[in-house]
Swiss-Prot record:
This is Fructose-1,6-bisphosphatase class 1 3. GO terms for molecular function: fructose 1,6-bisphosphate 1-phosphatase activity; magnesium ion binding. Signal peptide: none annotated. The gene is fbp3. Pathway: Carbohydrate biosynthesis; gluconeogenesis. HAMAP family: FBPase_class1.
Length: 364
């Protein structure tokens, strides 16, 4: 068979830059640095237990079970991935600052490195609780513009709506390593050639089908969901005999990168909605470095991303680590769920398909 000539990530970025004659090229350098960080993390993940990086991270006192700003137990690979993102991206002169799920405050670019005009926010290793069971994990990132003239960055500088993103993407560390990227002109997927150490364009112009018969949600939280979500899931579970007149499949991986990737590949809808399980955390996912980057990708691929009440990318952030309810995927399904939120007559009335203790009604 003749060898297929594929475009590299570098070539792709050069082609994109040519669409903007006044561009400096610094943006390309930033994306390539992010890609390099993802390559390093992919290598560490691939070694698994052989690399000695499985298990919980240690505290400064040497005790197992370090906790991040989110109150979550850190894995060793969480810490390594965060350090890798900082080290690879701080020196290039493209960034004014960074923010991470693993750090309470913004990261200042060291004085011995030049400052740039962009901000980078990231979740260095999404789904890290799955590491020890060898389920796909990933890194999520978003690029914003930095304010001009400031010597240091503040939390306020990062509090920009998703609509202000310059680029966003994720790396998926699975059977193959993929980088899925939008620079505001559609969504493209690149696969890492482990022999050459280069990302090649393998999935150009990704599109999310508008309709689907597949949804992803953590059904164990059903008793805490709001009525519109209970109604939607109840109708899906009723299948052909219910109001939707068709059967649905349910998926749940507990790794948002893996869920988002499946939806970009074949459609579906993902829900981690607002609920009442923990009044201090009405939403589970973080707006700036989880929800917004995925929302940008979904919208650029023809899908939709929402809280149920408004589009995700229109939300004005109030804090660096703000949590929010998230619904994204096939446009028609997300719009249906939004309609249920808008048109609910009694927000406390669950669907009759649910009872007090079960996802679906017991047989009569």
């Amino acid at each position: 068979m003749p060898e297929v000539q594929r475009m590299t990530l570098t070539q792709f970025l050069i082609e994109e830059r040519r669409r903007y004659p006044d561009a400096s090229g610094g943006f390309n350098g930033l994306i390539l640095n992010v890609a390099m960080a993802c390559k390093e993390i992919a290598r560490a993940v691939a070694f698994g237990a052989l690399g000695g990086l499985h298990g919980k991270a240690s505290t400064q006192a040497g005790e197992e079970g370090a906790v991040n700003v989110q109150g979550e137990i850190q894995q060793k690979l969480d810490v390594l991935s965060n350090t890798t993102f900082l080290r690879v991206n701080e020196w290039g002169g493209y960034l004014a600052g960074m923010a991470s799920e693993e750090m309470e405050a913004p990261y200042q670019i060291p004085e011995n490195y030049p400052r740039g005009k962009y901000l980078l926010v990231f979740d260095p290793l999404d789904g890290s609780s799955n590491i020890d069971v060898n389920v796909s994990v990933g890194s999520i990132f978003s690029v914003l513009r930095a304010p001009e003239g400031a010597d240091t960055v503040t939390e306020q500088d990062f509090l920009q709506p998703g609509s202000a993103q310059v680029a966003a993407g994720y790396a998926l560390y699975g059977p193959t390593t993929m980088l899925v990227l939008t620079v505001g002109n559609g969504v493209n997927g690149f696969t890492l050639d482990p022999n050459l150490g280069e990302f090649f364009l393998t999935h150009p112009h990704l599109r999310v089908p508008p309709d689907t018969q597949e949804f992803a949600i953590n059904a164990s939280n059903s008793r805490f969901w709001e009525a519109p979500v209970q109604r939607y899931i109840g109708e899906c579970m009723a299948g052909k005999s219910g109001p939707r007149g068709k059967d649905f499949n349910m998926r749940w991986i507990a790794s948002m990168v893996a869920e988002a990737h499946r939806i970009l590949m074949r459609g579906g809808v993902f829900m981690y909605p607002r609920d009442t399980k923990d009044p201090a955390k009405p939403g589970r996912l973080r707006l700036l470095y989880e929800a917004n980057p995925i929302a940008f990708l979904m919208e650029q691929a023809g899908g939709r991303a929402s809280t149920g009440r408004q589009t995700l990318m229109s939300v004005a952030p109030g804090a660096l680590h703000q949590r929010i309810g998230v619904i994204f995927g096939s446009r028609n399904e997300v719009e249906r769920i939004e309609g249920y939120h808008t048109n609910q007559t009694d927000p406390d009335l669950p669907s009759p398909l649910f009872n007090e203790r079960s996802l679906f009604r017991a047989s009569a």
